A protein has these predicted regions:
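C-terminal motif of bacterial Sec signal peptides marking the signal peptidase cleavage site
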Residues: 16-19
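Bacterial N-terminal signal peptides that target proteins for export
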Residues: 1-10
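N-terminal targeting sequences that direct proteins away from the cytosol to non-cytosolic compartments
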Residues: 21-252
């Protein structure tokens, strides 16, 4: 009887401990990749400091032929920042208060309200201090969130990846590459490998090709661009062309 009472007491203790414990236990971060919730007073958000933050977070992704923002932002007033909003994966909290802060400073915390979450806090005594900080550290915020998302993707791909891509590249091209697991359609030739998720929306394609090194000009931008164009022209004739590539799309492995 004493043993049963001890077990019941221990069980009740564990239940109470779980009920009283705070933190992100059991809560997973929500939201989509490259989305950030900005928590900031409305007056500041509508003012010059908010404009500076918006311009940085939505700055163009470098290297793309068209304009595309690096991050998608959602604004929330501090008075409404509660509940499910606190579980979002990327959060930026901006505090402007001259009675508390003497200079602009930035910090971050992982897993504050949910696992897999990062919360960045930017404190400053004035809107001008926010602007000065942004000018002194251009793209610091956007680069941080982009790096966080890249690391998340790396961690996910280390655990869950396409064995089709990995096995073909490893066996036929002496390469190892962790591609998204939904990339199961592929075409493989001697010097050219293509994989795709073949999705109607959100389609993702991966291309790997090799060519011989001939002279130092091989590594110039002009040569690499010309080589890329010639390889893709040969292997990707376009949707209108009924070529081996188009046929491969309809009957892939």
């Amino acid at each position: 009887m004493k043993k049963i009472s001890l077990q019941i007491s221990l069980l009740m203790f564990l239940v109470l401990l779980g009920a009283c414990s705070s933190g992100p236990v059991g809560k997973r971060a929500t939201g989509l990749a490259y989305e950030v919730v900005v928590v900031m007073k409305k007056a500041d958000w509508d003012g010059s400091s908010g404009k500076a933050i918006k311009q940085e977070l939505t700055s163009d992704v470098p290297g793309l032929p068209q304009s595309e923002p690096a991050l998608k932002i959602t604004y929330v007033d501090p008075s409404q920042f509660d509940g499910l909003l606190t579980y979002v994966r990327n959060i930026l909290i901006v505090n402007i208060d001259p009675s508390i802060y003497t200079k602009a400073s930035i910090s971050y915390e992982n897993d504050r309200w949910a696992k897999g979450q990062v919360v960045v806090t930017l404190n400053a005594p004035s809107p001008e201090a926010i602007i000065e900080y942004s000018q002194a550290h251009p793209k610091a915020l956007v680069d941080f969130f982009v790096k966080v998302e890249m690391n998340r993707a790396i961690g996910q791909l280390e655990k869950d990846y396409s064995t089709v891509v990995m096995d073909n590249l490893k066996n036929n091209h002496d390469l190892m590459l962790n591609a998204p697991s939904n990339m199961t359609y592929y075409r493989d030739t001697t010097d050219f490998f293509w994989a795709s998720n073949n999705a109607n929306t959100g389609r993702t394609d991966l291309i790997v090709y090799t060519f011989p090194y001939t002279d130092p000009n091989t590594f110039t931008a002009e040569y690499l661009v010309a080589k890329r164009d010639s390889v893709l022209k040969e292997n990707l004739p376009g949707a209108a062309a009924e070529a081996p590539w188009s046929q491969a799309m309809s009957g892939l492995h």
